[in-house]
């Protein structure tokens, strides 16, 4: 697979995560997910994640931590995915692609986790990234600036 799937769990200063809603044609359904997209050859995974966060949400982050790498569906494709945790956010104007109609919301991290548990967030990279961050929180693996922000 030529692109590498990337996702970002952006955490703001109040412990909210930014989610993106959009219609996904392959499933003929609306989907809530973390900001994500494809990283083309020639750019690093981190550069692609930074670009997607900026384009979809108008957000840049000072700090980044890779939290999960995965095979997205190894019985059907060789596409790989990587997700990052991003914090120390700055906000600007979103720059979605012409064919993207996105709805961007902020919810407490715990609410995003509940949406995963209820099956409202179904995208595999989003589910894996949110659950990984929750596990890091439960196991005391979050970096100091995030410990008080991410509540599970």
Listing of model-derived features with the role each one plays in the protein:
Residues 1-2, 7-51, 55:
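Conserved Nudix-box catalytic region and its N-terminal flanking loop in Nudix hydrolases
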Residues 34-66, 84, 96-98, 108:
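The catalytic Nudix box helix
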Residues 12, 24, 54, 58-92:
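Active-site segment of metal-dependent pyrophosphate-handling enzymes
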Residues 10, 19, 85-86, 106:
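Conserved hydrophobic "DFG−1" position in protein kinase catalytic cores
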Residues 30, 75-76, 82, 99-152:
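Nudix hydrolase/Nudix homology domain
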């Amino acid at each position: 697979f030529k692109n590498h799937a990337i996702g970002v769990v952006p955490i703001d200063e109040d412990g909210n995560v930014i989610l993106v809603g959009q219609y996904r044609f392959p499933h003929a359904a609306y989907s809530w997910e973390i900001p994500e997209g494809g990283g083309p050859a020639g750019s690093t995974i981190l550069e692609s994640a930074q670009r997607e966060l900026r384009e979809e949400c108008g957000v840049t982050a000072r700090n980044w931590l890779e939290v999960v790498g995965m095979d997205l569906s190894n019985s059907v494709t060789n596409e790989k995915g990587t997700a990052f945790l991003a914090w120390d956010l700055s906000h600007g104007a979103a720059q979605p692609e012409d064919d993207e109609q996105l709805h961007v919301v902020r919810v407490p991290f715990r609410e995003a986790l509940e949406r995963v548990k209820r099956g409202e967030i179904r995208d595999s990279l989003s589910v894996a990234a949110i659950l990984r961050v929750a596990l890091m929180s439960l196991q005391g693996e979050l970096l100091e600036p995030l410990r008080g922000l991410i509540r599970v």
